[in-house]
Amino acid sequence: MTTVVITGAAGNIGTKLRRHFEGLGWTLRLLDPVAIAHEGAVVADLAVWHDDWVAQFREADAVVHLAGNPSPKGSWGSVQRLNFDLTMNVYEAAVRQGARRLVFASSNWVVAGHRFEDWPLTAEIDPYPVNPYGVSKLVGERLGRSYSDRWGLSVICFRIGYCQRDHDNQPGAHMGWGLWGQRMWLSDRDLCQGFEKAVRAPADVRFAVLNLVSQNEGMRWDLEAARQTIGYEPLDHSVPTESDDARAQTAASRHARRLIETTEGFVQEQKW
């Protein structure tokens, strides 16, 4: 019987994964500051170390770590507590309690600064976070590397695409960030199969950072590493559409970005 701990189990992604894992017959231990009607649920603030919630990690086959501030607009103060301190506690609990693997919900915000470029987005590309949230996810990935190297914890980090809470998670022009947002759409089916495959991945997968998006037309996210590492193959795809207003906004943002880069280059070249 597969035993999985889900942190942040009451959230958008946590709810979808919980239902999927239940359908597989897995034993679930659910952690969230919000009460969940489930026999394996524990109400806990994971930013505060406590033996009661730490015990839930004991010899789990996998810890799916989703908990934290999910907002790209989160302040430094909120992500420090909920995305830095909390994530450190989760890694530490996984190691101390003998969990086999930790699957970390990272984000495409780690590379958001590459939005207006053209090259493929692989896990090896230089990180380019543009907000505290993106920085916190990058730190979570690096913690995973450290805990894997030092303590032998198997860690898989997913740079998760755009998986909506509303609109039945259907793609379309209603999604934010123009074509960039639509091209990183992640269907519920692909979300669930990606995490299922991560939990089931061979023991020799020691550390990996993988993109997790659906097969969307014109997307830049490279999925080859996910295919090779865990056997991920997207089930769904979309064809992005863009309104005139969104197209104009994207063009203006791209132009502003180029002006900023030009100004930065000029300032750096001067001898002040």
Map each language-model feature to its residues:
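NAD(P)H-binding glycine-rich loop region in Rossmannoid oxidoreductase-like domains
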Residues: 46-82
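Alpha-helical substrate-binding/gating segment
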Residues: 162-172, 185-207, 215
